[in-house]
Curated annotation (Swiss-Prot):
NCBIfam families: Dhydh_Halo. InterPro entries: D-isomer_DH_NAD-bd, Dhydh_Halo, NAD(P)-bd_dom_sf. NAD(+) binds at T145, L146, V224, A225, R226, D250, H274, V275, S276, A277. Catalyzes the stereospecific NAD(P)H-dependent reduction of 2-ketocarboxylic acids into the corresponding D-2-hydroxycarboxylic acids. Can use both NADPH or NADH as reductant, displaying a marked preference for NADPH over NADH. Shows a broad substrate specificity, although it displays a marked preference for the 2-ketocarboxylic acids having an unbranched chain of 4-5 carbon atoms. It comes from Haloferax mediterranei (strain ATCC 33500 / DSM 1411 / JCM 8866 / NBRC 14739 / NCIMB 2177 / R-4). Keywords: NAD, NADP, Oxidoreductase. Its EC number is 1.1.1.-. One of its GO terms (biological process) is carboxylic acid metabolic process. This is D-2-hydroxyacid dehydrogenase. Belongs to the D-isomer specific 2-hydroxyacid dehydrogenase family.
Length: 308
């Protein structure tokens, strides 16, 4: 494979300013061009994109600027002989800090005070409501880049960290690593259950009514994975019934979250618009990955984060 051009698809604008991304790639060694929706591709072309377009299949290589590539038809890329890479590995810090923020918000009741501020109300919490994260247990489901970013920050806050990992292999700062078949055991005693898994056939619908019934009544769910990992109707029912105390949700089965979703109206639900990995340096992080792979193509080495 020989790359003669990198096309920056207009869809990257959903995650970062395209021009800043192009400028970050100015030293790439090949022309870097903005590509609109009618752009055509051919041999020698590489594409950086937020989502899939059929025209990309005529290029040699497509880089997804996100970690999640579930919108890309992997089998079709394989049949077309088009390389596909993703941006996993660069989100640990941002997502880890976001999750730490969620947990601190619930523990210190910051969301309740913000709500009261909007009403110009000097509302004090009930004595039993505020708590500290130190000594509390968090279960991180999925111990890849995202999960480890959460683990390290939770450990720094003095939390007891357990996790769920397909292999069951040990991870630094995680006291116990469970395999997925022991999910209920892993989440049963956790004050927070953090979902940081990719969306696969195995993880779709992984958290539903039985899991909410297993969780502590004072526990909160945090989802920075993918919306369909959780059965949303069961989550609403669990919040309604008091099976769990709250949830911090960055991802949803349907995005944007519909205006009539009952999730908007729970006092102890934090909703963010799929931005847990957002950072003003994102264009630089993705550019570094692309630069690394351009160099690997030149030397014939295996691409970093190759999906197909």
């Amino acid at each position: 494979m020989h790359i003669e051009r990198l096309a920056v698809d207009e869809s990257v604008g959903r995650a970062m300013p395209p021009q800043r991304f192009i400028e970050a790639l100015s030293d790439l060694g090949v022309p870097v061009e903005f590509a609109g929706e009618d752009e055509q591709f051919g041999p020698g072309d590489a594409v950086a994109s937020f989502g899939h377009r059929d025209a990309f299949l005529d290029a040699d290589w497509v880089h997804c600027i996100r970690a999640g590539y579930d919108e890309f038809p992997v089998g079709v890329y394989e049949e077309a002989g088009t390389y596909l890479t993703n941006s996993t590995g660069i989100h640990g810090t941002t997502v880890g800090e976001t999750v730490a923020g969620y947990m601190l918000t619930f523990a210190r009741r910051l969301h309740a005070y913000r709500d009261a501020q909007h009403d110009h109300a000097w509302d004090l919490p009930r004595y039993e409501e505020p708590f500290t994260l130190a000594g509390e247990r968090v279960c991180v489901v999925g111990l890849g880049t995202l999960g480890r970013g959460v683990v390290d920050r939770a450990a720094a806050l003095g939390m007891e960290v357990v996790g769920v990992r397909r292999s069951g292999d040990p991870v630094d700062n995680v006291s116990t690593v469970y395999t997925p078949d022991r999910l209920h055991e892993a989440i049963a005693d956790a004050r927070f259950v953090v979902l940081a898994t990719p969306l696969t056939d195995e993880t779709e619908g992984m958290v539903a009514a039985p899991e909410f019934e297993t969780m502590r009544e004072d526990a909160s769910l945090v989802n920075v994975a993918r919306g369909p990992v959780v059965v949303e109707s069961d989550l609403v029912a669990a919040l309604d019934s008091g099976d769990i105390a709250g949830a911090a949700l960055d991802v949803f089965s349907e995005e944007p979250l519909p205006e009539d979703s009952p999730l908007w109206d729970f006092e102890d639900v934090l909703i963010t618009p799929h931005v847990s990995a957002a950072t003003s340096k994102y264009h630089e992080d993705v550019a570094a990955l692309i630069r690394e792979n351009i160099e690997k193509i030149a030397t014939g080495d295996e691409l970093t984060n190759r999906v197909v």
